[in-house]
Amino acid sequence: DVCSSDLGKMSSNTRFALNTWYAVALVNDGSTLTLYINGEKDNSMTVAPYEYALYGVQIGMPSKGYQSSQLFYGRLSEMRLWTRPLSAREIKANVCGVDPSTNGLVSYWRMNEGEGTTFYDLSPSKRDISYKNGITIDWTYDDTNKCLE
């Protein structure tokens, strides 16, 4: 499952292959949550209206109603949060990166520091993510340009 709400759960329709890079985007326009895989619409669900607020983001962690066997076992290359819903065209155009000063970009973590326990936010808001309490990051290096594949 990609996410769940009081209105139900949403899963991807994509059969993910091992050792394959995917660009995953979730867009919430206030009434519909849409999942994009590699810039193409994959699935969507109705969601309740919301007020913009960042209460917390869980990636790869079991949440209410999920089993520990559903943990995310993979690698992340970057993560972005926006204050506005992006169009499919914008998602596709920004798969390989985005200008940190782009209108509506709240946070942009490239996750390419290579050492330490902090992901630095390149956006003007500077919401760095630091891991504490013995949590470590397993840094890996991959010089393959996924955007050219």
Describe each model-derived feature in a short phrase:
Residues 1-3:
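Single conserved hydrophobic/aromatic residue that forms the stacking wall/gate
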Residues 5-91, 96-125, 136-149:
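Extracellular glycan-associated modules
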Residues 131:
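Active-site and glycan-interaction determinants of carbohydrate-active enzymes
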